Amino acid sequence: MLISLMKEEEIPQVAALEQVCFSEPWTEQGLRESFARPEYLFVTATEDGQVVGYAGLYQVLDEGDITNIAVLPSARKKGIGTALTRALIEAGEQRAIHAFTLEVRVGDAAAIHI
């Protein structure tokens, strides 16, 4: 598995991942618009050239709001979500982000565990 900053060509795969993982997914267009804005930061996890997970944040001054963490159902329970979160925080720290937030639903045990 390789975790890296998201590349523009990965956006269609990330949009497909959103469709699988969320009841109110980001659209491909929404992802493209956010990707183009400097206050957004995204990382992806890939296996054999396929995106199996991604995470994103929105930066305001020195704070980062983690917007999404998604992992394909078939790739879950392998630590990918945790690895994505760590990579996102490390990339955020490179941008002088010093505080990170992540809102989770009460029943989302996987997100709470991160």
Residue ranges and their predicted role:
Residues 82, 98, 107-114:
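Conserved active-site alpha-helix within GNAT-family acetyltransferase domains
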Residues 66, 99-104:
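Conserved hydrophobic beta-strand within the GNAT/NAT acetyltransferase core sheet
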Residues 2-74, 78, 82-95:
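Acetyl-CoA-dependent GNAT
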Residues 29, 103, 112:
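Conserved catalytic-core motifs of GNAT/GCN5-like acyltransferases
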Residues 71, 105-106:
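Short amphipathic helical patch at the helix-1/turn junction of helix-turn-helix
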